[in-house]
A protein has these predicted regions:
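Compositionally biased terminal segments of proteins
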Residues: 1-130
């Protein structure tokens, strides 16, 4: 397994997503990180935003993320081996007032990533500006 220090954004997101899923928590990547992944970093984001579709307590998520050396400070989780910051915005998974219906599944060497579609990613970024 690749060390966190050597993971790109997609690999790190898949690693976190899989670690959470192995603990019964299904999270979907949303926000700017999706655009970074779909655009091959032509748009760069250092926030890894997951929506927790399992409605798990923040305390439980924090405990699970501690297992992979992520510590919580305010609403963010960080790991000294990476510049990416992880956050869990409140759900439900939606773009504006519309529910997200299409979730993509991307297999990487570090795990499985559940991510909103390219179209919903664009709509999400566009909605964030208005």
């Amino acid at each position: 397994m690749k060390s966190i220090r050597n993971m790109n954004l997609a690999e790190l997101a898949a690693y976190i997503c899989t670690h959470l899923m192995n603990n019964g928590i299904k999270c979907i990547l949303t926000g700017g990180a999706c655009i970074s992944i779909y655009s091959e970093n032509k748009y760069e984001s250092f926030d890894v935003d997951f929506i927790d579709n399992s409605f798990t307590s923040k305390k439980k998520i924090a405990g699970i993320l501690e297992e992979i050396n992520f510590t919580e400070s305010n609403r963010y989780f960080s790991n000294p081996e990476t510049e990416y910051i992880v956050e869990f915005p409140s759900g439900p998974l939606s773009i504006g007032s519309q529910a997200v219906k299409e979730i993509k599944e991307i297999e990487l060497s570090t795990g499985t990533l559940f991510i909103i579609s390219p179209t919903d990613s664009f709509k999400d970024r566009f909605a964030a500006y208005f």
